[in-house]
């Protein structure tokens, strides 16, 4: 397996991994302890990704070499992630419990990978929840309280949860009126809920609604769709830091 294929071609995942973590870090007090935790978080994601690809390909591929290509990256990333995780947890044992909370969601993602249904709506939502939960973890590590992190974590969940149906309307389900209507309806509700969390979030979530309503069907290239989501993710990070 070439080195370039060690990193998954899932650009949206990186924003989902980074934005809640960075929001939690800067809503609290950034510390050196955040660095090994961030490394453990990203390496853990890479390890799980390759493990799930091995699981999927072991079942569906007729080429025995296909699943084997993911074994080495899974072990390398997993070992490195575990090392950084233990480094983080040694002075903060509660991080082990926080990590365990992600287990049910990883199990759901693994079941969908085994069934070769990774593009399922529920599978996407199951991936979003622990990613947004990292805001709580990073905030607590920086001296903040769990309670202070609930509203900003919900804001992240509202946005990244909405990207699951929205991106489908731009690519795989671009011809589905049902997905389009569902995505727009979700974003309408998200604007209201976000505004209830804090009025500061009304403007960015109104923009997210407009992009969900206006961009599908315009034939945008995948790269453009990704660039728009990067900008939206950065806007979310800025809004959360200002609002909370």
What are these regions (language model features)?
Residues 190-244:
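C-terminal transmembrane-bundle signature of multipass membrane proteins
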Residues 82-87, 93, 99-138:
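Intramembrane alpha-helical segments
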Residues 18-20, 68-81, 125-139, 180-193, ...:
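Small-residue-rich segments of transmembrane alpha-helices in multi-pass membrane proteins
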Residues 1-92:
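N-terminal topogenic module of multi-pass integral membrane proteins
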Residues 22-38, 83-97, 133-153, 192-201, ...:
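Helix-coil boundary and interhelical linker segments in multi-pass alpha-helical membrane proteins
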Residues 148-195:
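A mid-sequence, solvent-exposed acidic-amphipathic segment
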Residues 1-14, 60-70, 109-129, 170-184, ...:
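Interhelical loop and helix-boundary elements at the membrane-water interface
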Residues 34-45, 95-105, 149-159, 200-212:
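Hydrophobic core segments of alpha-helical transmembrane domains in multi-pass membrane proteins
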